[in-house]
């Protein structure tokens, strides 16, 4: 459902930020 899509998008965003900060 929409919640699953939102969670997946949010998780991806967090991973992207974490990767950016790690670099």
From Swiss-Prot:
Q: Which domain of life is it from?
A: Eukaryota
Can you list the GO cellular component terms from the UniProt entry? extracellular region; membrane; other organism cell membrane
Report where it is expressed, by tissue.
Expressed by the skin glands.
- Principal cellular location given in the protein's record: secreted
Q: Name one GO biological process term.
A: innate immune response
Keyword Iron carried by entry: no
- Keyword Secreted assigned to the entry: answer is yes
Keyword list (alphabetical) reads: Amidation, Amphibian defense peptide, Antibiotic, Antimicrobial, Immunity, Innate immunity, Membrane, Secreted, Target cell membrane, Target membrane
Where is this gene product found? Answer: Secreted; Target cell membrane
Q: Which residues carry this modification: Asparagine amide?
A: 23
Give a short account of what the protein does.
Antibacterial peptide with amphipathic alpha-helical structure. Shows selective growth inhibitory activity against the Gram-negative bacteria E.coli (MIC=25 uM) Has a weak hemolytic activity against human erythrocytes (LC(50)>100 uM). Is very weakly active against S.aureus (MIC=200 uM).
**Sequence similarity:** Belongs to the frog skin active peptide (FSAP) family. Alyteserin-1 subfamily.
Put simply, this protein is called Alyteserin-1a
């Amino acid at each position: 459902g929409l919640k699953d899509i939102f969670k997946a998008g949010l998780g991806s965003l967090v991973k992207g930020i974490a990767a950016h900060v790690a670099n």
